[in-house]
């Protein structure tokens, strides 16, 4: 009997060992539950940092000066229907030989507009090559329409008063239509070919130095008599005369004897011209003369024959003149399109 019990015990132990060896009595291990990945479209992006010290644009100041230009059949010795703007000081730009589509003209116009001048005067050659109606808006209005009133072109809005006062140049004469495209495009005082206006402390006289001027361009002409009488009658602190062909120049075209009128004797304070594609300042008989002809035409001229009295001659880059004036001072600067101040000159009342 004892032997039978031992045999049963042996087989029971053996079965238990087999079960343990096969792993059937091992405690089950719980597998972690898999978490599906979040789709990229549902991940909220990290918000960008809020900008700091953001510059707030400042509104451009609107010029307060006013000058109206009413065309008349013939110019008068003093401006008509041209109210004198106040107050002073005033700030204006001078450009010359600029009227040709291209990068130099674009650069100079950007420079001039960055000054926020009250108005612009030009020393001629506004519309290369031949003063035609077909090219006048792209050569002028494209760059300066904001200053022209009334503006009849296609490049944007014009000014609410006229702030653009050109002088006629030889390239503003059309072989077929004469000065008419120019006269149709602008609404200027007087007969439009030569005229005057007062702005702040300055009485401006724009001349037509072209030989095709009906009233002549020599010292004994109708035009010269008009200037002489106008200068004599002027009561402004300053009298500024401007034209295209220079009375004195050291550049390629040189001095034009026919325009060497007695400006100082007649009462002019300063004389501006263009024609030579240079910048030059001269003092002749104690009167300052400037040549401003680097405002857009790609050709730049060289020094040919230095005139006695020449103070500075420059032809290395394109640019324009900035003038600031009060009743007692006029301050002239010629500045290149790169912002280089080439020359400064100050006039003071005695």
Where are the predicted features?
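Ser/Thr-rich, Proline-interspersed low-complexity disordered segments
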Residues: 26-88, 350
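C-terminal motif of bacterial Sec signal peptides marking the signal peptidase cleavage site
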Residues: 19-21
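Active-site glycine-centered loops adjacent to acidic/histidine catalytic or metal-binding residues
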Residues: 97, 124-125, 169-170, 207, ...
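Short acidic, glycine-rich surface-loop motifs adjacent to enzyme active sites
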Residues: 234-250
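A short C-terminal boundary segment appended to hydrolase-like catalytic domains
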Residues: 31, 86, 312-350
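Extended active-site neighborhood of metal-dependent phosphoesterases/phosphodiesterases
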Residues: 113, 132-238, 256-270, 276-326
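N-terminal active-site segment of His-dependent metallophosphoesterases
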Residues: 83-139, 229, 249-250
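Bacterial N-terminal signal peptides that target proteins for export
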Residues: 2-10
